[in-house]
């Protein structure tokens, strides 16, 4: 049966190709031409049969009782001849040159003349090119041309990135109905409903005189019961526009009662008045007014998780529930990378080596990726200007800092510091570190970058600690660590910089120290249960975790060798001791570890 189907498909493709090529030849040679489409001062010869087969509009036109002369020359008003020419050629060749400059005009004309093949091609093109800068325009186009497939795709794109897109100027130009189509969506990616309210009120104030009259309808799409009662009292009740609107004051009264636990009786008439229609997926049993809707948005399922990134996948671990979730596949991520999460919860991976054959001057490059947690994929960014390893990563104001390390070509120790600006999408060099160092660690806290330990040019461990102020552009010494070390774990936990394990002049270490940022002093903490290097420390939701690393393990031959371990420990602050949580989590193998916030709604449980 399979061979018969394959043969039938092969014959169909052959016949389709033969027919398409034959039709194009007939058009090129102007054979059997029986009509002309006239747009402006240009006449385009074609065949009624082809137009009728591809367009219900033209089929009805040519089968109508219209005078024969009008069928021979069809005059099309308000049509760009260049766009029409592209569409006609597509009907004969199945090829069209779509670009950002012509796709909307082609889309509109295909919609007007009911040419589904061109229409579908345009929709697919626009869906693939959805971006923060054009998604609202594409949403508007989908609604205007009554194309649910495109409008829904654009709306979902906007919903996923609502916090970013609601700040754009295009958002402020949305019509009331366009705004409602966005904020009524259950899938809105907001952690707090307060963000929706603030976006709506900013939209109103952009054109207050005209938009106040639409506010009552838009108001129904905001899910006030998802807000804190304090925020509702301080910001919603006291808003001057809301206070001056009698209709909204009635709704405020109902909402105040709802916060007090008194809901109105559901009414079948609510749906008829439109008050319940904006809630999206509500049924007949949910006929309370829209502004009483308390269904959580999809973005409200965000949780603090430990992200483990290796060369296979990025996996999020929930230590409270002992569950793992697939965040993204990571086959392009190298093993020897470093990772960082910014204050804005943006996740970056830096490092690893590849050869850029087109760059003759500097063929060796280091990878640089950013995680798109919505699309669950890694986005390539401009590589490091100089390939290096054993460096430290810091972040201030969304800028990424790569501090010192080793040059991958010369193996020389480095003191240079590179800064990546995501707005300009460029790397720049900033103030050098006072010493050349590698195998150190870097941590950021409250707008400052701290560089700790590592090995210097003489291959000896250092205990020096530096602080970098990006606004002043200078490095300063802080109190040194008690034990010089490299390849250790670091985290900011409860206002202190905690370091654990690492390599010292005597070998692997289990010692743990804490640096008090207010007193500039180091204190000894409870030792980790095992001497380790490359251990990862993560402070998550008030708890400190230690993950993996390398320990000296006795082999069957009775010899000791550095071996990777993939366990998880938790520091119990009240008992001042380390407690084992997981003996092995395989996703930690070769992984960098981060404390981050991710939306469980969009993740797949492993």
From Swiss-Prot:
PANTHER family: KELCH PROTEIN, KELCH-LIKE PROTEIN 41
Function of the protein: Involved in skeletal muscle development and differentiation. Regulates proliferation and differentiation of myoblasts and plays a role in myofibril assembly by promoting lateral fusion of adjacent thin fibrils into mature, wide myofibrils. Required for pseudopod elongation in transformed cells.
Kelch repeats: 346-398, 399-447, 448-495, 497-542, 544-599
Protein name: Kelch-like protein 41
Ranges for domain BACK: 135-237
Keywords, ordered alphabetically: Cell projection, Cytoplasm, Cytoskeleton, Disease variant, Endoplasmic reticulum, Kelch repeat, Membrane, Nemaline myopathy, Phosphoprotein, Repeat, Sarcoplasmic reticulum, Ubl conjugation
Domain of life: Eukaryota
Involvement in disease: Nemaline myopathy 9: An autosomal recessive form of nemaline myopathy. Nemaline myopathies are muscular disorders characterized by muscle weakness of varying severity and onset, and abnormal thread-like or rod-shaped structures in muscle fibers on histologic examination. NEM9 phenotype is highly variable, ranging from death in infancy due to lack of antigravity movements, to slowly progressive distal muscle weakness with preserved ambulation later in childhood.
Keyword Endoplasmic reticulum: yes
PROSITE patterns: BTB
Modifications made to the protein after synthesis: Ubiquitinated by E3 ubiquitin ligase complex formed by CUL3 and RBX1 and probably targeted for proteasome-independent degradation. Quinone-induced oxidative stress increases its ubiquitination.
Protein's cellular compartments: Cytoplasm; Cytoplasm, Cytoskeleton; Cell projection, Pseudopodium; Cell projection, Ruffle
Gene Ontology BP terms: myofibril assembly; proteasome-mediated ubiquitin-dependent protein catabolic process; protein ubiquitination; regulation of myoblast differentiation; regulation of myoblast proliferation; regulation of skeletal muscle cell differentiation; skeletal muscle cell differentiation; striated muscle contraction
Phosphoserine, modified sites: 3
Quaternary state and interactors: Interacts with NRAP. Interacts with LASP1. Part of a complex that contains CUL3, RBX1 and KLHL41.
Organs and tissues of expression: Sarcomeric muscle.
Annotated organism of origin: Homo sapiens
A cellular-component GO term for this protein: endoplasmic reticulum membrane
Single GO term (MF): ubiquitin-like ligase-substrate adaptor activity
Pfam family, one: BTB
Domain BTB: 33-100
